[in-house]
UniProtKB/Swiss-Prot annotation:
Protein name: 7-carboxy-7-deazaguanine synthase
Metabolic or biological pathway: Purine metabolism; 7-cyano-7-deazaguanine biosynthesis
Gene, per the UniProt record: queE
Biological processes per GO annotation: queuosine biosynthetic process
Subunit structure: Homodimer.
UniProt organism field: Gloeobacter violaceus (strain ATCC 29082 / PCC 7421)
């Protein structure tokens, strides 16, 4: 399956498939960990990470979905910062228009992505690239995404992940290493050792899971 065939076209120009929305809560991962945010979790992801914590390891056919208008989504927002996650947000052709619509309300927007797909989102939007090519070789990171990313977050499950991506990491872009949650008794010590060897990088610990908030 190529990237072009995976892009989901909107039912209307101002709508998009949504799995769930929630907030205010805190961002638990990456550069903005601890910030108060609202989440818009878009439906759908073909990447198939085996440890996916949002239900898409098998493609997510059982997950809830609803086509929502931008205006309805914006009415629900309560925080100054909005995180658009998934699933994989960049499979949706309507993503750039959604980001623009939220931006017109004066809110900051961050987008979480595997980087396998590309849409030209506004320059002011924050893009968190969490590459998954090492577990899904059929979905390599789009080269444009390495140049566009505002931060890179690498999930550490076996320890070799950093070696896979280190040559692609853009100079000056914040990089965080995040231990895979389900095996954290093993992956947290492993991640700490990697950080000692690469002290320019930072630790991401999925703070929301430790605090047991959405």
């Amino acid at each position: 399956m190529n990237a072009a065939s995976t892009v989901v076209k909107p039912v209307s120009a101002q709508s998009i498939p949504v799995q769930e929305t929630f907030g205010p809560t805190i961002q638990g991962e990456g550069y903005w960990a601890g910030a108060v945010v609202d989440f818009i979790r878009l439906y759908g992801c073909p990447v198939g990470c085996p440890w996916c914590d949002t239900g898409y390891a098998d493609g997510g056919p059982q997950l809830p979905r609803a086509v929502r208008t931008f205006s309805d989504l914006i009415l629900e927002l309560k925080s100054p910062r909005v995180v658009i996650s998934g699933g994989e947000p960049f499979i949706h052709a309507a993503l750039p228009a959604l980001v623009e619509a939220i931006g017109r309300t004066g809110r900051a927007v961050a987008i979480e992505t595997s980087g396998a797909f590309w849409q030209p989102v506004p320059d002011w939007a924050w893009v968190t690239l969490s590459p998954k090519e090492h577990v899904s070789p059929r979905h390599p990171v789009n080269p444009q995404m390495w140049r566009r990313a505002n931060e890179v977050k690498i999930v550490i499950a076996g320890g070799a992940e950093l070696d896979v991506y280190r040559r692609f990491l853009p100079p000056g872009v914040p990089v965080s290493l995040q231990p895979e949650w389900e095996a954290r008794e093993r992956t947290l010590p492993l991640t700490l050792e990697l950080l000692k060897a690469h002290p320019r990088y930072r630790l991401s610990v999925q703070l929301h899971k430790y605090l047991q908030v959405p």
